[in-house]
């Protein structure tokens, strides 16, 4: 078998259409829905039987955090955009991934190559120094591949409540250290500068809660009390802590609107549909989606692009993918504490999603 890396194959609207009707898309989306299902009504502290691979995955993510400490930004105030040391961190991540992941089980060389490719791509783009829902999707693909290989049991909540929670913690450390730019620059019009899935999984966790309601995200005491137990509450608390304006209505109007939904179950249903429509069906995101032997390209999509050619990205709007550089909320918050407040530089006129 070939030991080539997974490659991009969705290069045109026609490719996207083929992918949308494919078994591969159904399998990946189905995997996300299974993960969502198994955390309904369960907080982060929920006790569940954990396969040994769960602890190994957490240990790997801890090693990623250790790498952040080894490659600190030399100048924390030189720019409000991404820190170039991220490239050194990412190179070290790629160099170490094989040794880390080979410990997960008996893997053939090609399987290890594919797992490492999705894993490394889960932490942002080394060239653009950015991160978005497409990179988060790569982590889901990494877990999906482990499931395909029979190494990960998803019929429990541990894949989300232990592994994904640790991944989110790891990404927050990476984002805070290197000020990764939001991929797509959705800014205030999206759910979050970086992530989507914590809101989906988090709303599933709260679907059966006795007294917490969607409107509870406006109660600072509730957020502080439950930020470690529920992903959704933790994300709102985090957003409030880094945004440079005080009101959720101002800095995150979509989240504010969603808080008006009557039940968390309805919120979760909407999040699942939104993930399908705004992540798994958008060309600016899926043009970076990679296919190999574990995640097979649908028949009829474009052949892989020339690896020596410059990557051409398709943009539906001016801020898609890698269009306009916009600082992260973390960067804006940090810089607003410095002389020459930069908070007014943050854009607020971007249309929602792609």
Swiss-Prot record:
It catalyses: [protein]-peptidylproline (omega=180) = [protein]-peptidylproline (omega=0). GO terms for biological process: mitotic spindle organization. It is an enzyme of class 5 (isomerase). It holds the Pfam family PTPA. Signal peptide: none annotated. It is found in: Cytoplasm. Its EC number is 5.2.1.8. Keywords: Cytoplasm, Isomerase, Rotamase. GO terms for molecular function: peptidyl-prolyl cis-trans isomerase activity; protein tyrosine phosphatase activator activity. The keyword S-adenosyl-L-methionine does not apply. Transmembrane segments: none annotated. InterPro entries: Phstyr_phstse_ac, PTPA_C_lid, PTPA_sf. GO terms for cellular component: cytoplasm; nucleus; protein phosphatase type 2A complex. Belongs to the PTPA-type PPIase family. PPIases accelerate the folding of proteins. It catalyzes the cis-trans isomerization of proline imidic peptide bonds in oligopeptides. Acts as a regulatory subunit for PP2A-like phosphatases modulating their activity or substrate specificity, probably by inducing a conformational change in the catalytic subunit, a direct target of the PPIase. Can reactivate inactive phosphatase PP2A-phosphatase methylesterase complexes (PP2Ai) in presence of ATP and Mg(2+) by dissociating the inactive form from the complex. This is Serine/threonine-protein phosphatase 2A activator 2. It comes from Yarrowia lipolytica (strain CLIB 122 / E 150). The gene is RRD2.
